[in-house]
Regions:
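Short helix-capping/hinge motifs at transmembrane helix termini and TM-loop junctions
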Residues: 37-39, 89, 128-133, 163-168, ...
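N-terminal signal-anchor/signal peptide hydrophobic helix marking the start
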Residues: 13-23
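Transmembrane helix-loop junction
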Residues: 35, 48, 126-130, 161, ...
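Short amphipathic alpha-helical coupling elements at transmembrane boundaries
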Residues: 10, 47, 57-60, 74, ...
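Membrane-water interface segments at the C-terminal ends of transmembrane alpha-helices
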Residues: 29-36, 66, 74-77, 142-171, ...
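Hydrophobic alpha-helical transmembrane segments of membrane transport/permease proteins
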Residues: 22-73, 163-186
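An internal, D/E-rich "acidic patch" concept
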Residues: 2-5, 65-122
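Alpha-helical transmembrane segments of integral membrane proteins
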Residues: 6-11, 99, 103-136, 152, ...
């Protein structure tokens, strides 16, 4: 319990410390690759009818003639101040506005997918461990492998084809506080598509952790002393075995987003 929470908090802390370095590294790599493109941004923005003077004016206005490091430094400075640039050639649509618009729905979808993953994978993993090498374990392991190998985008397309006309697959998302039923129905299919691969992985992680804990000496000693196995599992094994799955689950939050 408390140990699992502490491990998760330490993991989150390490990730937060590493996040700025990762952002700078990834942004530098992407910026460098984009700079190697033979396509002239000014030509793409202004089109074929643009005069050489107009193209040059566009390059000067947007700093495209500056050295690469100067351009990247300007981009990084703007990014640190919340300006991520624009999207769409020749438009003034800000990426920051796009992210701000999509982030609330992304967080809601992540939460629901995470909830599905926890409610399904943890009981399945525990059940598989308790029936190790018997048919429930074998069936659960087969389905977990299938889940791990199922691409979310492919499953999402299948769900849309299978449930079109039965569940809403398009249209605006109502606010949860206004229409919780409508919100859940519109979130259901994408949340399932996101959760299935995580369910497959987490089921295996929970099973492995439970099996390792069930094989420990204190479990055999307690059962040998006459304590019912279900009591040992409920009071000790579950608490100790869930430390690793909770940590791994924290890592999967980024995948769900």
């Amino acid at each position: 319990g408390g140990l699992a929470v502490n491990n998760l908090l330490r993991l989150i802390g390490r990730r937060l410390v590493a996040l700025p370095i990762m952002v700078v590294g990834v942004s530098f790599l992407v910026f460098f690759i984009m700079s190697l493109s033979p396509i002239d941004p000014a030509y793409s923005a202004l089109g074929e009818t643009a005069t050489p003077e107009a193209l040059e004016e566009y390059r000067v206005q947007h700093g495209l003639n500056d050295p690469f490091l100067v351009q990247y430094g300007r981009y990084l400075w703007n990014m640190l101040h919340g300006d991520l640039g624009t999207y769409g050639v020749g438009t003034s649509n800000h990426v920051t506005d796009l992210v701000a618009k999509a982030l609330p729905i992304t967080l809601q979808l992540t939460f629901l997918g995470l909830l599905f993953a926890v409610l399904i994978s943890f009981p399945l993993g525990v059940l598989a461990a308790l029936y190790r090498d018997r048919w429930p374990d074998q069936v659960i392991r087969i389905f977990s492998v299938i889940g791990i190998g199922t691409p979310s985008f492919w499953l999402a397309a299948l769900l849309v084809l299978g449930f079109v006309g039965k569940l809403p697959v398009s249209g605006p998302l109502p606010a949860f506080t206004v229409d919780p039923g409508g919100w859940f129905l519109r979130m259901l299919l994408p949340a399932i598509a996101l959760a299935v691969p995580v369910i497959g992985q987490m089921t295996r992680v929970v099973r492995t952790s439970m099996v390792e804990e069930l094989d420990r000496d204190y479990v055999r000693t307690a059962i040998g002393a006459g304590i019912p196995k279900r009591i040992v599992v409920a009071r000790n094994v579950l608490r100790n075995a869930l430390i690793t799955p909770v940590t791994v689950l924290g890592l999967r939050i980024g995948y769900l987003m």
